[in-house]
C-alpha cells in the first residue's frame, strides 16, 4: 500500500464524519444566503474547513506516513501485512492519539 492509499483510508475513517458536517452546514449556508438562517451556520462552515485543513496537515506529516497500514479490514490486514486484528487496532489508536495530541496542543482548538 502506498502513501496515497494510506491517506485515503485515514481520510475515510477520520475525516469523513467532519465532511458530512460540512455538507449539512452547507445546506444551512444556502438557507442563510436566502435570509432563512443565522450567521452561526456560516461561521461553522468556515471553522470546519479550517479544522479539516489542520487535520490533513497532521495526517500528511512524515511520521504518520512511515506507518505502512491504515486499511482496517481485518482479513486484508492479516493477508497483506501479516498483522493481527490487535495490531491493526493499535495502529488506529496511534493515529487517533496523534490527532488528540494536536487537539490538546491547541492546534485543533475547535474540538477541545
Each language-model region and where it sits:
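Short amphipathic alpha helix immediately N-terminal
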Residues: 57-76
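DNA major-groove recognition helices of helix-turn-helix
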Residues: 88-106
Amino acid at each position: 500500500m502506498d502513501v496515497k492509499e494510506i491517506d485515503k483510508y485515514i481520510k475515510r475513517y477520520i475525516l469523513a464524519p467532519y465532511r458530512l458536517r460540512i455538507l449539512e452546514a452547507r445546506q444551512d449556508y444556502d438557507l442563510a444566503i436566502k435570509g432563512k438562517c443565522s450567521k452561526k451556520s456560516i461561521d461553522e462552515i468556515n471553522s470546519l474547513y479550517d479544522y479539516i485543513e489542520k487535520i490533513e496537515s497532521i495526517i500528511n506529516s512524515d511520521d504518520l506516513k512511515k506507518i505502512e497500514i491504515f486499511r482496517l479490514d481485518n482479513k486484508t490486514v492479516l493477508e497483506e501485512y501479516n498483522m493481527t486484528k490487535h495490531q491493526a487496532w493499535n495502529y488506529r489508536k496511534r493515529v487517533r492519539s496523534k490527532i488528540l495530541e494536536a487537539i490538546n496542543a491547541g492546534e485543533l482548538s475547535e474540538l477541545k
